[in-house]
Amino acid sequence: MGKKYNINQTTHKILALFTTDYQRAIHLREIARNIQTDKKAVGIHLNRLENLNVLQSTQKGRNKEYRLNLGNPVTRHYLILAETYTTITYLEDNFIIKKLTGEIADKIDGAIILFGSYAKGEAKEDSDIDLLVITEKDIDRKIIIDTARIMGKEINIKTTTPKHLQNGIKENDPLIKEITQNHVVLKGVDCLVESMWRYHGER
């Protein structure tokens, strides 16, 4: 009999807790509190993810701590699913960023990551939109200028290459650290996951 890959909303929410730090260890009670779900239900999903070798656990006193199984290449694909789930739920609740994504996603070659106040859910009426673009190519700044004018918003854009992103993660660069801890991937989820996976998988 094959394993059952029953991936639902709760599974995505659990895995999303690990997308900011692939080395994170977290116990059941904290997971349940973070995703606002009953501990018993969370425990069922954690057991399933552990049986699938996506998570692994260690006993710390009376608590069981869970962390990503970075030795399983399939875990990377679960992280991509978790990031995608986060993006979908975020865009459905944030019309401005959803509109922005529609305006620029097909015009910019590379991954696009939202960070700053909008990614943290702290944006105000006059907040700027902060974007990181991961690309090997130059960006046509006119696209950003035109989009900012259409939306009536200031758009701050920073660029980096996949290699520089990986170096930034490795060197604990303050900006890259901020982005990995609070982000929404608007395009190119696999690019961010790959960069973080390479670093954390080699530690």
Range-by-range predicted roles:
Residues 1-108, 120-126, 135-203:
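Catalytic core of pol beta-like nucleotidyltransferases
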Residues 110-118:
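Short helix-loop-helix/strand-helix junction enriched in hydrophobic and basic residues
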Residues 131-133:
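Short beta-strand->loop micro-motif that forms the acidic, two-metal-ion catalytic signature
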